[in-house]
Amino acid sequence: MIARRIWRSHRFLRPFSSSSVCSPPFRVPEYLSQSSSSPASRPFFVHPPTLMKWGGGSRSWFSNEAMATDSNSGLIDVPLAQTGEGIAECELLKWFVKEGDSVEEFQPLCEVQSDKATIEITSRFKGKVALISHSPGDIIKVGETLVRLAVEDSQDSLLTTDSSEIVTLGGSKQGTENLLGALSTPAVRNLAKDLGIDINVITGTGKDGRVLKEDVLRFSDQKGFVTDSVSSEHAVIGGDSVSTKASSNFEDKTVPLRGFSRAMVKTMTMATSVPHFHFVEEINCDSLVELKQFFKENNTDSTIKHTFLPTLIKSLSMALTKYPFVNSCFNAESLEIILKGSHNIGVAMATEHGLVVPNIKNVQSLSLLEITKELSRLQHLAANNKLNPEDVTGGTITLSNIGAIGGKFGSPLLNLPEVAIIALGRIEKVPKFSKEGTVYPASIMMVNIAADHRVLDGATVARFCCQWKEYVEKPELLMLQMR
């Protein structure tokens, strides 16, 4: 009866139907084989797992297929499904459940981080957690089992099974405390690991008890103070303990790259294979400064913070309308240039989790106020490591606002498959000469455009930059052509 119910759920989700379970559509891979060798107890394999999104704006995902099931016992393996195009593995951040917990359909099971975003994985089945296969911090490949669920009436007997039997079925059994993990970012967890600290014993001072970098360093200092005291005592008795302790503080450390940092390695490595050229220009931002001040003085919404960036983004979109090849991508296999219909302008953001480039969709159809609100939303999500996969995919051109941190000149690398990226320097007052020879102060910003020389030539980029510069220096021209 249990097997029939499980099979009905598979038939409902699969694109084919069958009247029996005796003929699986795919060969069972070796890594799915269980301890039992009898045909009756051998699990069958269904279609490769994919993700389905539950709810229009939700960031929760679930696997629409169990990778392997045991029809005799009611065990279902829930795999890590495909979290996005080109994603082969994810880092497990934390568990929302522990072994023995009851779970409902669409209940969050865990949170994982791919190269592009942080995603909650939810349960497709109702049952109890029989086995958790990984701990926070583990790198899990797509298709590997995340958790084993006991479904229907067999769950009570499964959860009372001897622990050694469960280990044989699904791998090593972890302690509940280690599996749940502390609420923190990958960078903070790696820092704690490098310092030899169990992050679960640290009291977090961040939002919702999140363990921050400062918490780890503070805990490390306290631990180091105690260690130093002990070392000093040994130094009096033993002689050379102090020098041994001092030398150990300067040992090499290996820091694994995770999440966005790992994605940056892949993207920048690919970028080195593309022929770049750079075009540098100065833009007078006096009018931009006045416009920002006007918006600030007439702002009636306290939740909106006006900056230079929305106007730069909108003026960039207006220039792209006249030079569509700058808003394109290149297909090296077919030697074709794909002109993008939408202006999805990405903005590079440096966060404590790494560099991420979310993009504002359809800028050509948005007002300055709408761009300001969307930019604020993306910045908030990026700071909290909550960007959706849709927010970081589909970009057509990128702005890197290095001037917000410091520096007036940058030399960016392409964010493939885009063909252009623009580094914005700091706006600063410098002396300039007028046509009459008098000196006057001007707010100048240096911009550096990196372009794919397979698609764009110097003349095209120069004309494009001059058009963008004109819109920035004379924002009233935007009013003539805005739709």
Swiss-Prot record:
EC number: 2.3.1.168
Role according to the record: The branched-chain alpha-keto dehydrogenase complex catalyzes the overall conversion of alpha-keto acids to acyl-CoA and CO(2). It contains multiple copies of three enzymatic components: branched-chain alpha-keto acid decarboxylase (E1), lipoamide acyltransferase (E2) and lipoamide dehydrogenase (E3). Within this complex, the catalytic function of this enzyme is to accept, and to transfer to coenzyme A, acyl groups that are generated by the branched-chain alpha-keto acid decarboxylase component.
GO biological process terms on file: cellular response to sucrose starvation; fatty acid biosynthetic process; response to absence of light; response to sucrose
EC class of the enzyme, as a word: transferase
Keyword field: Acyltransferase, Fatty acid biosynthesis, Fatty acid metabolism, Lipid biosynthesis, Lipid metabolism, Lipoyl, Mitochondrion, Transferase, Transit peptide
Active-site residues per Swiss-Prot or TrEMBL entry: H453, D457
Cofactor annotation: (R)-lipoate
Tissue localization of expression: Expressed in the non-photosynthetic organs such as siliques, flowers and roots.
Transit peptide: 1-75
Species the sequence originates in: Arabidopsis thaliana
Subunit details: Forms a 24-polypeptide structural core with octahedral symmetry.
Protein induction: By dark treatment (at the protein level). Induced by the calmodulin antagonists trifluoperazine and fluphenazine in darkness. Down-regulated by sucrose in a hexokinase dependent manner (at protein level). Up-regulated by Leucine and its derivative alpha-keto acid (KIC).
A single GO cellular-component term on record: mitochondrion
Subcellular compartments: Mitochondrion matrix
Taxonomic lineage of the native organism: Eukaryota, Viridiplantae, Streptophyta, Embryophyta, Tracheophyta
Family: Belongs to the 2-oxoacid dehydrogenase family.
Keyword Transferase appears in the UniProt entry: yes
Recorded catalytic activity of this chain's protein: N(6)-[(R)-dihydrolipoyl]-L-lysyl-[protein] + 2-methylpropanoyl-CoA = N(6)-[(R)-S(8)-2-methylpropanoyldihydrolipoyl]-L-lysyl-[protein] + CoA
Residues annotated with N6-lipoyllysine modification: K116
Metal-binding recorded as keyword: no
PROSITE patterns noted in UniProt: BIOTINYL_LIPOYL, LIPOYL, PSBD
UniProt-recorded Gene Ontology molecular function terms: acetyltransferase activity; dihydrolipoyllysine-residue (2-methylpropanoyl)transferase activity; zinc ion binding
Domain Lipoyl-binding: residue ranges: 76-150
Protein name listed in UniProt: Lipoamide acyltransferase component of branched-chain alpha-keto acid dehydrogenase complex, mitochondrial
Peripheral subunit-binding (PSBD) domain mapped to chain residues: 183-220
CDD domains noted in UniProt: lipoyl_domain (cd06849)
Cofactor binding: number and manner: Binds 1 lipoyl cofactor covalently.
